[in-house]
From Swiss-Prot:
InterPro entries, sorted: G_OBG, GTP-bd, GTP-bd_Obg/CgtA, GTP1-OBG_CS, GTP1_OBG_dom, GTP1_OBG_dom_sf, OBG_GTPase, P-loop_NTPase
Name the UniProt record assigns to this protein: GTPase Obg
Keyword Iron belongs to the record: no
Species the sequence originates in: Acinetobacter baumannii (strain ATCC 17978 / DSM 105126 / CIP 53.77 / LMG 1025 / NCDC KC755 / 5377)
Location of this chain's protein in the cell: Cytoplasm
Binding site for Mg(2+): 173, 193
Enzyme category, top tier: hydrolase
């Protein structure tokens, strides 16, 4: 199934049914009085998180949703039936944004969590409500109110504890295959991974975390190179970034230069995202002779001036991967425990997350607009080039025809 992480839809709740003006008409009951019923309430529209849904692709093809109108009231004080509600299911991790105001309507992070995005109209009042001592036969009734109408944007960010970061073909997909049951496509060419992949990593019994593999970045991604920075937003909800470095790139490039390029692109996209804890993994050690591995790895670390945690692995042979898993599990558990025990730290984490969410959303929208502008400029340039092919100045091959009347 095609992975879609954004969609814009319109939702319109049902209008309320109309109240009616009716009078009781029964044999032997003169002056029965008003008995008009109220209109039913219009159906509302809800969006609900669902574990069985993994993409927003359905909302790319069906963009308009409307709930049922409430039924009109009837005589004998009968209230009209309410309109049926509409429930739209989306993946867990979906943020709902009002496109007009930019306000966040809801953030669905748990299975079954539900948010109302359009409220149904109220039913109108029947004439029973308007009787009084001075008006015993009111003919007044009211119509139902209009249902709420909205245009909303659905934004999906995968929920994971650890996010994989690195150049294309650095071995991220091979690594996640080695430590989890996830089976992303693996091949010997760049950009094998085209969409985010999630895997549950089991450290020990009852100890596990979720890891996300996103498509690789290249230098200039912030300007739209490669797959651009479209998928970087999926790292916004992770706790730790795992930077995978290919120690022996197939194109002969410098691993340290590649790592610096990734760090720069990350900082360009979101300075807040770049502040997340980063763990370095020097991968594909099997590509280097055993006697020169330590020296080469140390050279890379010296070039990067790296002082943080670092691991040396071979995802293909699954060497050193367990140590990475245990370290990540310990770090995640420590963060979780501290958030529970220290309210001040928990508040700081929430503020950091809110800032990160806002920053990544803003940068993603800006990047999309810049990409559209670039594509428009390219199309215009292409049209200009086509026009240049028709040069009217050169008339060497032109033939002038003169018609003479006999």
């Amino acid at each position: 199934m095609r992975f879609v992480d954004e969609a814009v839809i319109t939702v319109e709740a049902g209008d309320g049914g109309n109240g009616v003006a009716s009078f009781r008409r029964e044999k032997f009951v003169p002056f029965g009085g008003p008995d008009g019923g109220d209109g039913g309430r219009g159906g509302s529209i809800y969006i609900q998180a669902d574990d069985d849904t993994s993409t927003l692709v359905d909302y790319r093809y069906t963009r308009k949703f409307r709930a049922e109108r409430g039924k009109n009231g009837a005589g004998a004080n009968c209230t009209g039936r309410g309109g049926e509600d509409v429930v739209l299911k989306v993946p867990v991790g979906t943020t709902i944004v009002d496109t007009d105001s930019g306000d966040i309507i809801g953030d669905l992070v748990e299975d079954g969590q539900r948010v109302m995005v359009a409220s149904g109209g109220e039913g109108g009042l029947g004439n029973t409500h308007f009787k009084s001592s001075t008006n015993r036969a009111p003919r007044k009734c009211t119509t139902g109110t209009k249902g709420e109408f909205r245009e909303i944007r659905l934004e999906l960010k995968v929920l994971a504890d650890v996010g994989l970061l690195g150049m294309p073909n650095a071995g991220k997909s091979t690594f996640i295959r080695a430590v989890s049951a996830a089976k992303p496509k693996v091949a010997d060419y760049p950009f094998t991974t085209m969409v985010p992949n999630l895997g549950v990593v089991d450290a020990d019994r009852h100890r596990s975390f979720v890891m996300a593999d996103i498509p690789g970045l290249i230098e200039g991604a912030a300007e739209g190179a490669g797959l651009g920075i479209r998928f970087l937003k999926h790292l916004a909800r992770t706790r730790i970034l795992l930077h995978i470095i290919d120690v022996q790139p197939i194109d002969g490039s410098d691993p340290a230069h590649n790592a610096k390029a990734i760090m720069n692109e990350l900082a360009k996209f979101s300075p807040t995202l770049a502040k997340l804890p980063i763990v370095l993994v020097l991968n594909k050690l099997d590509q280097i002779a055993e006697e020169s591995r330590e020296e080469w790895c140390q050279h890379i670390l010296d070039e990067l001036q790296w002082t943080g945690p670092v691991f040396k692995t071979s995802g293909l042979l699954e060497e050193g991967t367990k140590e990475v898993v245990y370290y990540l599990m310990d770090q995640i558990e420590q963060q979780r425990e501290r958030e529970v025990e220290d309210p001040e730290y928990a508040a700081e984490v929430r503020a950091f997350r809110e800032q990160l969410e806002a920053e990544t959303r803003e940068q993603t929208i800006a990047a999309k607009e810049a990409y559209r502008a670039m594509r428009k400029a390219q199309r215009l340039e292409s049209m200009m080039d086509d026009d240049d092919d028709f040069d009217d100045d050169e008339d060497d091959g032109d033939v002038e025809s003169i018609y003479v009347r006999d």
